[in-house]
């Protein structure tokens, strides 16, 4: 059990590792290849575009060829891309390697959830999703620091050697076969979509969009407007991640994850930003409660999104993964663009995340109404 648990956690974390570890190396890569910063940003932005498409495709391919087989093949692709990046002497070779990495990374977060759904009983599944979400949150916390430490002693291409080793370890942990707890389920020929799938997908998309807005706007708020140094902001961001992880672990306890309470707390937590408060203490407290409340419901939202008809969990997870990635990227992009109107970074963050919290409350309400109607019909 521990081996499959660790395997799924590593598989879910690969995309975060691939994007966050090279962030400290971007200025170094710019100098190494003698190019402008916007071009070198393609190593991240281009990666994310291909990664989103790979997420969508991997679920469909996994249903046809087998999820475990496709996941192993994807890590072999990621390994090949990492080696190509490690050996690259031109920008085009580096970008080609990153493209291969992105294709390989797309299957990890998607198929790990699908495999967890088919392998674990519902109670264990909720705990597994909490741990997978926590591990995925830890990687963005550790990866940039690890990248900076490596760059302090070795060349930039050593980062890709670490990624290659990560993929090798994950492949070695791959189980030979999967034990399905719900093997008696008969595949549905009428499609997999259920109201719960739609509502769960909307919820994870709204939650991730809120997080992306915070990640995009909080540096300007705390460093430019409130005067924190880069180091102090890094510590604050680390604390935010830790509160998100704490929320993930709270999700294991049913009594602690009332969605109405959590999203109301989430909405209230951004009031200091809406009011343009200059109190550093209030803004920090709001940030911590913001991340805690989102983290507490994120695993449950993923669990809801996996409640489908039939056994096409790979396709369902890939559709959810694609929608949440595209939604979060698009919404956070337009939130940042709003600052060009003179609205201010703090008020932009507050208003955008408040709207997302209210939309989440609306989705939760429709979810509960659907559950009530379904239960009533079944009686």
For the regions a language model picked out, list residue spans one by one.
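Extracytoplasmic
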Residues: 3-37, 58, 214-219
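Helix-breaking motifs and short loop linkers at transmembrane-helix boundaries and internal kinks
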Residues: 34, 66, 87-93, 104, ...
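Conserved MFS/SLC helix-loop-helix module at the cytosolic interface between two early adjacent transmembrane helices
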Residues: 53-91
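Paired small-residue
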Residues: 77, 81-84, 92-100, 281-289
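Cytoplasmic helix-loop-helix junction between adjacent transmembrane helices
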Residues: 97-136
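Helix-loop-helix hairpin linking two adjacent transmembrane segments in secondary transporters
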Residues: 122-175
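Transmembrane alpha-helices of Major Facilitator/SLC transporters
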Residues: 233-254
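A late C-terminal transmembrane helix in Major Facilitator Superfamily
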Residues: 306-345, 352-353
């Amino acid at each position: 059990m521990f081996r499959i648990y660790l395997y799924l956690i590593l598989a879910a974390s690969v995309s975060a590792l691939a994007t966050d570890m090279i962030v400290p190396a971007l200025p170094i890569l710019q100098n190494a290849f003698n190019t402008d910063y916007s071009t070198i940003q393609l190593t991240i932005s281009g990666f994310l575009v291909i990664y989103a498409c790979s997420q969508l495709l991997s679920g469909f391919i996994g249903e046809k060829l087998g999820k475990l087989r496709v996941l192993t093949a994807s890590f072999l692709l990621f390994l090949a891309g990492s080696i190509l990046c490690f050996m690259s002497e031109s920008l085009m070779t580096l970008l080609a390697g990153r493209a291969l990495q992105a294709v390989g990374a797309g299957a990890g977060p998607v198929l790990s959830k699908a495999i967890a759904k088919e392998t674990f009983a519902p109670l264990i599944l909720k705990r597994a999703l909490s741990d997978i979400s926590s591990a995925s949150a830890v990687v963005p916390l550790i990866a940039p620091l690890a990248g900076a430490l490596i760059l302090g002693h070795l060349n930039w291409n050593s980062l890709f050697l670490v990624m290659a080793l990560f993929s090798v370890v994950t492949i070695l942990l791959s189980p030979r076969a999967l034990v399905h707890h719900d093997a008696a389920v008969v595949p549905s020929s009428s499609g997999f979509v259920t109201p719960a799938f739609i509502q769960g997908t909307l919820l994870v998309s709204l939650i991730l969009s809120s997080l992306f807005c915070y990640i995009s706007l909080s540096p300007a708020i705390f460093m430019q407007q409130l005067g924190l140094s880069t180091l102090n902001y890094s510590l604050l961001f680390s604390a935010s991640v830790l509160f998100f992880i704490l929320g993930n672990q709270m999700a294991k306890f049913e009594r602690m994850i009332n969605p109405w309470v959590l999203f109301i707390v989430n909405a209230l937590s951004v009031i200091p930003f809406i009011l343009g408060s200059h109190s550093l203490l209030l803004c920090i407290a709001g940030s911590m409660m913001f991340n805690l409340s989102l983290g507490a419901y994120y695993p449950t939202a993923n669990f809801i999104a996996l409640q489908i008809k039939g056994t096409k969990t790979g396709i369902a997870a890939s559709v959810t993964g694609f929608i949440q990635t595209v939604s979060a990227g698009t919404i956070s992009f337009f939130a940042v663009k709003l600052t060009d109107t003179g609205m201010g970074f703090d008020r932009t963050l507050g208003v955008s995340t408040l709207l997302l919290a209210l939309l989440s409350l609306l989705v939760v309400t429709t979810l509960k109404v659907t559950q009530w109607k379904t239960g009533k019909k079944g009686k």
